[in-house]
From Swiss-Prot:
<keyword id="KW-0336">GPI-anchor</keyword>
<feature type="lipid moiety-binding region" description="GPI-anchor amidated alanine">
    <location>
        <position position="112"/>
    </location>
</feature>
<protein>
    <recommendedName>
        <fullName>Neuritin</fullName>
    </recommendedName>
</protein>
<keyword id="KW-0472">Membrane</keyword>
<keyword id="KW-0770">Synapse</keyword>
<keyword id="KW-0325">Glycoprotein</keyword>
<feature type="propeptide" description="Removed in mature form">
    <location>
        <begin position="113"/>
        <end position="142"/>
    </location>
</feature>
<dbReference type="GO" id="GO:1990138">
    <property type="term" value="P:neuron projection extension"/>
</dbReference>
<comment type="function">
    <text>Modulates postsynaptic dendritic arbor elaboration and synaptic maturation.</text>
</comment>
<dbReference type="Pfam" id="PF15056">
    <property type="entry name" value="NRN1"/>
</dbReference>
<dbReference type="GO" id="GO:0098552">
    <property type="term" value="C:side of membrane"/>
</dbReference>
<dbReference type="GO" id="GO:0005886">
    <property type="term" value="C:plasma membrane"/>
</dbReference>
<feature type="signal peptide">
    <location>
        <begin position="1"/>
        <end position="27"/>
    </location>
</feature>
<keyword id="KW-1003">Cell membrane</keyword>
<keyword id="KW-0732">Signal</keyword>
<keyword id="KW-0449">Lipoprotein</keyword>
<dbReference type="GO" id="GO:0045202">
    <property type="term" value="C:synapse"/>
</dbReference>
Amino acid sequence: MGLTLSGRYISLFLAVQIAYLLQAVRAAGKCGTVFKGFSDCLLQLGENMANYPQELDEKENLQTICTYWDDFHSCATTALADCQEGATDLWEKLKKESRNLDFRGSLFELCAGGNGAIRSSVPFGVTLLITALSALVTWMQF
């Protein structure tokens, strides 16, 4: 299956939402390190995905990827924790909206209950890396 046009739009949507979140935090002016912290989270996620062990079986592969995904969310929540003006609430809202997107093979779907197997013909790490990098590029333009 791989990335489709609708998958690109969903990735763009998520990137715009993340950029909106960061812009709102920056406008609040009370989170001096939020950009550095959040970008560090994205970079760590990308690094993990680019370097995860290829020799794992499908179940171990999914568990490893989901661990990286969970670590990213923990990192992002921590980066936003010191911010005021509802930045953490915006992040939680973004995660909820992202879970509700009907995007087969998303990390929210695959990591929700350990139920999924990777069905995409594109390596999952590539898909996630592209999504994370598009968010980072969008963020850097602000």
